[in-house]
Amino acid sequence: METVVDNSGYPLTSGIGFHKEGRNLVLTLNKRSLVSNMQSDAGAFEGWALCLFANNPGIYEKIFIQWNPIERFDKEGIITDAERGHYYRFLYRAYKFQDNYPTIVELQPAVSSVFDVDEFKDWVLNYPNGESRESQKSNKNAEAHLERELLEIMQSAFDYCDHQLPVGLFFKDVSKKTARCSGGLGQIDLWSVLNGSLNIYELKNDVNLSVGIISELMFYTNVMNDFRMHRFNYPAEFVRKRKFYRHSKELYDSISKDEISHVNGILLANNLHPRITDNVIDLMNQNAVHITYSKQTVNDFISLLRR
């Protein structure tokens, strides 16, 4: 193996091994990568892979993701509950990464060779059980505060919109015992629906610069695309609820009626990691599932909404 070619001038994370093998970019993930938060440097394998591939044109033809499965991970004592949630999410993310980019991404081993991917068909989403908490208004830099400010401006620009949409995934029904990803805590920052398009915004403030924003957004857009395609659904008890929160019923109804035809993912930040170039966005848009990605500054987004 050769040293990885990277002409960006910016440091690589120490949490992932990077090598060049002929015309192939090889990422080697250790156990920490498999059980880390996807926005962490060690966990954001999609972000690092796409940035290196796109920003070094003509150098690489394929991306290989090498990893060692954690045996008996679903048994108590092998890994912690939190790590198990991250590992289930890794399995889904890795499977989707190859599914989204089948001509350039190869998993070694393939997820389907070590995990029954048919289980994904039985995963269900959790849903809001109440209004979100008021953000800490004294902290003007907090993403939660910025999120609420943007949501207020968004109200008149879309068919409907909201924030903190849960994306916890569970096996057949929502319970602590059946939790798969996020432990019920994962949520989409901001989202909107307009003319049949579901827009997913991954919001970062001016000091939160990370390649992991790519991995986060790709996870959320793939989950919502699977929801749109009826591969995921809300559990049966959702429709029996008397009260719904954060426009979850409107979204459910739109999806049930096949009114959502497209998913857009938007990196929403005034400053992004310098590796996240236009070349990276172009590569992200070459996915086989027709999710559209873009980046937009918070300032431009506000200006557009106020026109």
Walk through the language-model features, giving the residues of each.
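Charged, terminal alpha-helix-loop-beta segments
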Residues: 1-307
